[in-house]
Amino acid sequence: MTAPLTLALSKGRIFEETLPLLAAAGVQVAEDPETSRKLILPTTDPNLRVIIVRASDVPTYVEYGAADFGVAGKDVLVEHGGSGLYQPIDLNIARCRMSVAVPAGFDYANAVRQGARLRVATKYVETAREHFAAKGVHVDLIKLYGSMELAPLVGLADAIVDLVSSGGTLKANNLVEVEEIMAISSRLVVNQAALKLKRAALKPFLDAFERASQNGV
């Protein structure tokens, strides 16, 4: 019996916005990862199962073949590297932007002009380093894993680099967006070996995902 394909997803927005794409392929996930303790979830298609992993781990699971394909944000792929993965489709889901934000009243543009050395808190250290280096901005980067907006409020950092959707969280914490680094959306990533060895099994899903993403499903 042929082993089922494995799709790697992370909990939250990406999982929720991938469900309509799976539905377009005629598949439903049998359990909700928010309420189930299981990390391997069956689907209504016996030839597909879903594994739930951290968003930053999706590329690793796919690259090493523990998953045949997965859905990962551009932020994760840029920060952690997706060079060993086939990335056939921008799914146009989980859209947001990666931006620089500072406390309201902080003159970021003037600080940059004056050549000030800024402390920046972010979990996207490599992406932030490349961005500021390209602009000639001097920064000390502080790696955090969450609650980024807190860092400027308690004097840990002058600025943050984080994902922004509506901007509501920034506003609630008296922060303002001063620079967009890149637009973010989630991509389908495929293991290179699986693409060759399991192409017939993968193709219906790749085609359905592509059609659904183009049609705004």
Curated annotation (Swiss-Prot):
GO terms, molecular function: ATP binding; ATP phosphoribosyltransferase activity
Free-text function comment from the UniProt entry: Catalyzes the condensation of ATP and 5-phosphoribose 1-diphosphate to form N'-(5'-phosphoribosyl)-ATP (PR-ATP). Has a crucial role in the pathway because the rate of histidine biosynthesis seems to be controlled primarily by regulation of HisG enzymatic activity.
Family membership: Belongs to the ATP phosphoribosyltransferase family. Short subfamily.
Keywords: Amino-acid biosynthesis, ATP-binding, Cytoplasm, Glycosyltransferase, Histidine biosynthesis, Nucleotide-binding, Transferase
Catalysed reaction equations from the record: 1-(5-phospho-beta-D-ribosyl)-ATP + diphosphate = 5-phospho-alpha-D-ribose 1-diphosphate + ATP
Its EC number(s): 2.4.2.17
Matches recorded under HAMAP family: HisG_Short
Keyword Cytoplasm belongs to the record: yes
Notes on the domains: Lacks the C-terminal regulatory region which is replaced by HisZ.
Signal sequence coordinates: none
Organism from which the protein derives: Burkholderia multivorans (strain ATCC 17616 / 249)
Assembly and interaction partners: Heteromultimer composed of HisG and HisZ subunits.
CDD domains on file: PBP2_HisGs (cd13595)
Pfam families, per the entry: HisG
Pathway listed: Amino-acid biosynthesis; L-histidine biosynthesis; L-histidine from 5-phospho-alpha-D-ribose 1-diphosphate: step 1/9
Descriptive protein name: ATP phosphoribosyltransferase
One GO term of the biological process aspect: L-histidine biosynthetic process
InterPro entries registered for this protein in UniProt: ATP_PRibTrfase_cat, ATP_PRibTrfase_CS, ATP_PRibTrfase_HisG, ATP_PRibTrfase_HisG_short
A GO CC annotation given for this chain: cytoplasm
Localization (cell): Cytoplasm
